């Protein structure tokens, strides 16, 4: 049975670079003989975190069906890829909210980060690595893609081939880390 990689997007924008990159990431996962499952933040309908209990509390079980679906996808994945934009040097609030809804689901999960933006998503990468380590996940690889150098602002790869190379390198690292 092929390994399952969950890809968690990070932008609510319908024309985001992440939406443009997602098919390339999915294809690269499938080319590595793995299954790609997507948690699309834009369509997942996750509410802002508003539970009276924290996910780190013993016995926490979210009651919202959208959160339950997200939790199940993360919990059953063999590894994850965080496809995240960088907004003002930070990870997106929508992706942070999705992360905040979960706790034990992240434990010991290998995670790769594909960040994108004007500065290759370095600020978002650093935040995600720190946050994922705090949640006891295993961030094992990160790649940054720069607008107008590696990808267009809509996520289309530029002729350099850097985007595809970076994504393939990240996925190969994840395969070794599972």
Q: Model-predicted segments: where are they?
A:
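Glycine-rich nucleotide phosphate-binding loop and flanking beta-alpha elements
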Residues: 88-89, 120
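Structural signal for hydrophobic packing residues in well-ordered secondary-structure cores
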Residues: 132, 136, 171-178
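Rossmann-fold NAD(P) dinucleotide-binding segment
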Residues: 92-108
């Amino acid at each position: 049975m092929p390994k399952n990689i969950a890809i968690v997007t990070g932008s609510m924008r319908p024309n985001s670079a992440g939406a443009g990159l997602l098919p390339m990431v999915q294809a690269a996962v499938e080319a590595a003989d793995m299954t790609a499952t997507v948690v699309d933040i834009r369509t997942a309908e996750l509410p802002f975190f508003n539970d009276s209990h924290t996910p780190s509390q013993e016995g926490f079980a979210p009651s919202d069906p959208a959160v339950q679906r997200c939790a199940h996808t993360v919990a059953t994945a063999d590894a994850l890829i965080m496809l995240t934009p960088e907004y003002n040097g930070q990870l997106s609030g929508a992706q942070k909210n999705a992360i905040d809804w979960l706790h034990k689901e992240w434990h010991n999960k290998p995670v790769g980060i594909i960040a994108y933006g004007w500065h290759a998503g370095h600020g978002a990468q650093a935040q995600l690595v720190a946050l994922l380590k705090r949640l006891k996940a295993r961030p094992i690889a990160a790649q940054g893609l720069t607008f107008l150098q590696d990808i267009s602002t809509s996520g289309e790869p530029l002729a350099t081939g850097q985007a595809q190379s970076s994504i393939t390198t990240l996925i190969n690292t994840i395969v070794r880390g599972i």
